[in-house]
């Protein structure tokens, strides 16, 4: 049972480290805990964002690094974090906030992270956001570009 408890603690630490990396708001930091074969899926699928490889996600994420400042992401309640040792998955609910030239941006996310066997790296990411907030930001960006 000690191995089970240790792996659970490692999975939880990797998940919280992932959020810490998001708060550094650099491409290198956001990619640092991903395996080379890590896939990143955005949901809902109605957003039309494809599943990205690690390299593709770095390019996608890099588009937003200069757009936002004072970014912060936080786990809403660590007690509500779901850690499944057998499947090496962690599910967590987060809230994010950032400043943009178009005003403040806030959103909510559910993350499903699948880790490596030792729990120290991320093999797969499913990110589910409040799509209305994401679409609102994109519409503001497009309006500014067309103005």
Language model segments and positions:
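Charged/polar, solvent-exposed surface patches and flexible loops
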Residues: 13, 17, 32, 59-66, ...
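A beta-strand edge to alpha-helix "cap/lid" segment located at domain peripheries
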Residues: 3-5, 65-147
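Short, mixed-charge, low-aromatic patches
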Residues: 12-22, 48-52, 65-70, 93
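Short, well-ordered alpha-helical segments
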Residues: 12, 55-58, 107
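Hydrophobic pocket/interface hotspot
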Residues: 18, 29-31, 38, 57, ...
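Short, low-complexity N-terminal intrinsically disordered segments enriched in polar/charged residues
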Residues: 1-32, 36, 143-147
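A solvent-exposed, acidic/Ser-Thr-rich amphipathic alpha-helical stretch
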Residues: 31, 35-88
